[in-house]
Amino acid sequence: MSIKKDGIMVILSSPSGAGKTTLVKLLSKNKNFHISISHTTRKPRLNEIADKDYYFVDHDKFENLIKNEEFLEYAKVFNHLYGTTRTPVIEKLEKGENVIFDIDWQGADQIKNKKLNYKLITFFILPPSKEILFERLSNRDMKDKLIVEERMKEFSRDVLHWINYDYVIINDDLEECYSKISSLIDAEINNGSKDYDKDFIRKHVEKLTS
């Protein structure tokens, strides 16, 4: 008789525009991860689908969820609230299903501090350069230069939290970045060897923040 295993949790965080949402969708499709759908008080972006990409709610609804202690994690990002409700995540993990989170460093810290009895692997995604990040943000649905400038300021602060993650991956090529994350997840699950150069990452962060 086989012993049922609990699912694992994988967190992907990154500065805005570094590509984590695309990577989360790839991992969900190719590695059978359930994407944890966050609640948010911001308005939908172009091509975002309610109840698939996010649960779009007003501030009162969000505050009620906080009051009722329904969030596994929540944070304020760019003047909007984001949060992950506990029950859907725990239900999936207990059934042996894996869950992947697209959240920022604040949410990642909260989940780590909860010390849940499930395996957790955390990744921080970096752009290859500040110039490429600026280009990505400018080409997205952000025609307002002030918004792009705000994102770049936040980047300088957010990137400092890389040290709190298990792995930091540079997204200079989407397929290669996905492959690295996928291999590291497999190695973590199977207790295999992990090809990861932390000194190289440290030097890259120093270059990004100089």
From Swiss-Prot:
GO cellular component, one term: cytosol
Reactions this protein catalyses: GMP + ATP = GDP + ADP
Primary location recorded for the protein, binned into one broad class: cytoplasm
Lineage: Bacteria, Pseudomonadati, Pseudomonadota, Alphaproteobacteria, Candidatus Pelagibacterales
UniProt keyword Amino-acid biosynthesis present: no
Residues where ATP binds: 14-21
PROSITE patterns per UniProt: GUANYLATE_KINASE_2
Family to which this protein belongs: Belongs to the guanylate kinase family.
EC top class named in words: transferase
Purpose of the protein: Essential for recycling GMP and indirectly, cGMP.
Encoding gene, per UniProt annotation: gmk
InterPro entries listed in its UniProt record: GK/Ca_channel_bsu, Guanylate_kin-like_dom, Guanylate_kinase, P-loop_NTPase
The protein, known as: Guanylate kinase
Keywords: ATP-binding, Cytoplasm, Kinase, Nucleotide-binding, Transferase
EC number: 2.7.4.8
GO molecular function, one term: ATP binding
Entry-linked Pfam families: Guanylate_kin
Localization terms from the record: Cytoplasm
Protein origin, superkingdom: Bacteria
